[in-house]
A protein has these predicted regions:
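Glycine-rich, proline-tolerant flexible connector loops at the mouths of alpha/beta enzymes
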Residues: 11-19, 74-75
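Non-cysteine beta-strand/loop elements that form the S-adenosyl-L-methionine
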Residues: 1-10, 67-68
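Alpha/beta catalytic cores of nucleotide-metabolism and tRNA/nucleoside-modifying enzymes
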Residues: 21-44, 48-172
Length: 172
């Protein structure tokens, strides 16, 4: 194979891990795949919600990332306010492409659009560039060699996001 798509059940509308009892956290899957054969390109799929997730996936060994829900829900040229979003293993998707449904491993829903493609892509680009700079990396190879990993607790995750508004303020 020229490339391997890593991660089962990590997508925002996927229930494969719950239905089948199979799958690992996305970052662990990327680590495992990247260690096996570096002649094969690694595609990270599922669980990418922020530019920071992209940087972590690339640092773990991914050569590419898929950004399903992150990019899927951007402004439509049709001017609609909601868009159908569904997993490829959802009942609706199975009926469309197989004309029958086995046990669904995903859901379908209508989700509000998030904004313009240009704004989101500029934000992602800025976050990725910043992530590389914090690592001291000028390219993907340097990122993967210079990265230092540590475990983060749930308290550390809460501290990492904005949190003043939940205590005593209203976000502007």
């Amino acid at each position: 194979a020229d490339a391997v798509r890593c991660n089962i059940g990590g997508g925002s509308i996927c229930s494969t891990r719950l239905v089948t009892g199979h799958g690992l956290p996305g970052l662990q899957t990327i680590f495992d795949c990247a260690r096996t054969d570096r002649d094969v390109k690694i595609i990270a799929d599922g669980g990418i919600k922020t530019s920071g997730d992209i940087v972590k996936a690339l640092a773990a060994g991914a050569d590419f990332v898929m950004c399903g829900s992150l990019l899927e829900l951007l402004t439509s040229a049709r001017g609609e306010k909601f868009k159908e979003y569904r997993g490829m293993a959802s009942k609706d998707a199975q009926m469309e492409w197989r004309h029958k449904s086995s046990t669904p491993e995903g859901v379908a829903s209508y989700i509000p659009y998030k904004g313009s493609v240009l704004d989101i892509l500029q934000d992602l680009e800025g976050g990725i560039k910043s992530g590389f700079s914090y690592t001291g990396a000028r390219n993907l190879t340097e990122l993967q060699h210079k990265v230092e990993w540590s475990r983060q607790t749930p308290a550390g995750t809460r501290e990492s996001s904005t949190h003043i508004f939940s205590q005593n303020g209203v976000q502007k």
